[in-house]
């Protein structure tokens, strides 16, 4: 059994797809036929099961700023992604969004940089594309790195808006980081398509990642 725990979503999927003994976890919204998602406790990962709580593995997709956003484009864009229109895009792409409020752009001009989590990035790319049709005056650059870089980049000014696929750490909040939940994401536990394992319990997943279970025979 080989645990694939990489900072890149694509890196995890590639590694699992090429190793019949591998296991990893990725964003539900990034799931493809290259890997197989196992059920957890007999429950399939889906937007519906995450929302109703029957699928227990989920995480927030956070947008992060250094304190309250002040850049006009950032303020307008954040309002958009949290609006009814932005949340509908999240829902349409397999994530769990909220109802959101109506949105009217203030049409600010300027450039912002959004960067961070590779799990959040596919959804953010779609949101940026949609926002540009609403406000063509704005320029938004997307940089895909990881959650920790997303938070530190927002605090240091490298990014106007950071992306993190986790809760903020106490030290990050104490440093001035402020988060808003963009959407809720199911965490898909994935194995190679050739693996005959179809279901794992939460305890088995914990055992795999703590090293208590080291072969697939241990979970049969």
PLM features: residue spans?
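Exported/periplasmic ABC-transporter solute-binding proteins
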Residues: 4-220
């Amino acid at each position: 059994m080989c645990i694939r725990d990489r900072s890149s979503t694509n890196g995890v999927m590639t590694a699992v797809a090429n190793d019949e003994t591998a296991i990893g976890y990725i964003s539900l919204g990034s799931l493809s036929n290259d890997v197989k998602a196992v059920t957890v406790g007999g429950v399939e990962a889906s937007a519906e099961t995450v929302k109703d709580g029957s699928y227990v593995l989920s995480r927030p997709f956070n947008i992060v700023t250094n304190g309250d956003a002040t850049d006009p484009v950032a303020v307008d864009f954040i309002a958009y992604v949290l609006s009814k229109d932005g949340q509908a895009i999240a829902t349409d792409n397999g994530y769990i969004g909220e109802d959101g409020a109506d949105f009217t752009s203030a049409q600010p001009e300027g450039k912002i940089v959004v960067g961070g989590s590779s799990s959040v990035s596919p959804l953010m790319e779609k949101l940026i594309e949609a926002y540009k049709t609403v406000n063509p005056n704005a320029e938004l650059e997307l940089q895909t790195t990881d959650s920790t870089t997303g938070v530190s980049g927002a605090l240091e000014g490298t990014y106007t808006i950071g992306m993190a696929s986790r809760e903020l750490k106490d030290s990050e909040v104490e440093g001035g980081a402020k988060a808003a939940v963009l959407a809720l994401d199911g965490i898909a536990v994935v194995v190679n398509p050739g693996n005959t394992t179809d279901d794992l319990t939460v305890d088995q997943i914990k055992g795999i990642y703590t090293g208590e279970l080291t072969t697939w025979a241990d979970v049969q």
